[in-house]
């Protein structure tokens, strides 16, 4: 069998305003900045690179492919897993995050809550729910 495709080493989100996104991700959510240049800011989240990239400066990465035009609605959906969705939700609310869905148990066995970053990317916090035997 050939090389395996079974790991994601980085997530890169295109953003409209790099400074606004840096303030949200570092200042509100809290991960440390690992690198920063005129086009992007990189954070380390549990061993994975998480990068916000100014969309109008993504020429090298897109190699001539057009970038999306501004539109309404979510463009990405990301999940962070936690052992206590209610505690993480309360902590993020204290830091100024506005949730559009409060923590609730879902039929797929998770307790989830949802918020958006400044560019409308949807984040889910998810906690596995212990099933009764």
Kindly give the residue locations of the regions a language model identified.
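Short glycine-/small-residue motifs
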Residues: 122-125
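Conserved active-site tyrosine of GNAT-family acetyltransferases
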Residues: 21-26, 92, 120
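Vicinal oxygen chelate
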Residues: 1-9, 32-80, 87-116, 127-133
């Amino acid at each position: 069998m050939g090389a395996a495709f079974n790991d994601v080493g980085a997530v890169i989100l295109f953003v409209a305003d790099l400074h606004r996104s840096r303030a949200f991700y570092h200042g509100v959510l809290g991960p440390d900045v690992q690198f920063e240049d005129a086009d992007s800011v990189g954070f380390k989240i549990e061993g994975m690179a998480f990068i916000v990239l100014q969309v109008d400066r993504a020429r090298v990465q897109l190699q001539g492919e057009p970038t999306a035009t501004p539109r309404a609605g979510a463009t990405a959906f990301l999940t962070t897993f936690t052992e206590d969705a209610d505690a993480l939700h309360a902590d993020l609310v204290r830091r100024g995050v506005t949730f559009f869905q409060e923590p609730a148990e879902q039929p797929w066995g998770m307790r989830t809550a949802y918020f958006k970053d400044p560019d409308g990317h949807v984040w889910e916090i998810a906690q596995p729910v212990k099933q009764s035997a």
